[in-house]
């Protein structure tokens, strides 16, 4: 039986977080943050099953590169307490296979975020 769990967090400069660092961590990748000059390297982190950047139609195509996307967010939001991103942790049903879970998440993200003009990573 599937167990429901969903946790929502805000990535905020006020709490000392960075959208570039959060994206690098979640995608197990290396990214340079133009805002503070820090290189975030999480290439040794394991456990990534799938990654995708989803953009609304009006978003620039260069934002398909997550490093450019999150650096653009960091550049746009200037204040010390800026809310840069939202992070969601969702439990997926173990009864479904990997492809079904990916499709389930893609549909959820598209309907609830991308169709409302937000970028999703």
Predicted regions and their residues:
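N-terminal nicking endonuclease/strand-transfer module with a His-rich metal-binding environment
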Residues: 1-121
